[in-house]
């Protein structure tokens, strides 16, 4: 995997977590060599190992192990714990958090993965969501865009050149998915209920979620990825301050 502009980083256990308003975004490869994969597998909990074993495709299984292992490394370093000792819990819709309530109150995180690239965002003072997607061709993308976008968003989408529409579709997707993760609602509300404004532009943007069940606002920014062909976004339930993006190396020296 060709990485542009981010040096490999591995912090030591107990390194300071993000300060108020600050977010750390760690980017890593999900395609790792067998020795690294074995080391990451050793960090997983029994339920994570069970989830991995239920995946029939060998590459999908290996990427799951690589993603969960490196997530544990990132969170363990923030907490000053061994990666294998980190305990997670999940909301009914699958949003992960730390099992210990005191730890969960001071450290929020959000993982994402697409194809060969994984991302973990960490923040201390607000709920967050991150999403990364590989830009690729989708059959009948026009119909999917009509279902996903609001009226004003679709007008903007329809005006851009056809050669740019796949990229713009995924730019919309990651912003809405990251916002849904920050709110903990997943896809339940429907992406057409998430209104991005102002858009397009440099951001940060606000994303309003209005439905019978939810009225909420998140803030969202694009996160440049160091690997060509991917797009990503970060969302939070409070305004977004400084964002530090770094490449995570699971075997770099502490």
Place the predicted regions along the sequence by residue.
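Core catalytic alpha/beta fold that binds nucleotide/phospho-ligands
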Residues: 1-254
């Amino acid at each position: 995997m060709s990485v542009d502009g981010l040096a490999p980083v591995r912090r030591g256990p107990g390194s300071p977590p993000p300060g108020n308003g600050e977010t750390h975004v760690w980017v890593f490869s999900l395609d790792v060599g067998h020795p690294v994969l074995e080391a990451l597998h050793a960090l997983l909990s029994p339920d994570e190992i069970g989830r991995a074993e239920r995946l029939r495709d060998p590459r999908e299984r290996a990427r799951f192990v690589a993603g969960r292992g490196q997530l544990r490394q990132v969170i363990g370093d923030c907490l000053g714990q061994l990666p294998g000792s980190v305990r997670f819990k999940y909301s009914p819709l699958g949003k992960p958090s730390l099992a210990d309530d005191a730890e969960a109150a001071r450290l929020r995180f959000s993982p994402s993965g697409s194809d060969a690239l994984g991302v973990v965002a960490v923040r201390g003072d607000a709920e967050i969501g991150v999403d990364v997607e590989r830009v690729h061709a989708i059959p009948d993308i026009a119909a999917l865009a009509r279902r996903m976008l609001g009226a004003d968003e679709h007008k903007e989408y329809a005006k851009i050149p056809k050669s740019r529409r796949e990229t713009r579709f995924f730019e919309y997707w990651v912003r809405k998915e990251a916002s849904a993760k920050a709110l903990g609602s997943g896809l339940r509300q429907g992406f057409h209920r998430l209104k991005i404004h102002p858009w397009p532009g440099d951001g940060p943007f606000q994303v309003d979620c209005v439905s019978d069940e939810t009225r909420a606002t998140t803030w969202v920014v694009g996160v440049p990825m160091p690997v060509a062909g991917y797009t990503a976004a970060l969302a939070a339930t409070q305004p977004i301050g400084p964002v530090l993006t770094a490449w995570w190396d699971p075997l770099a020296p502490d």
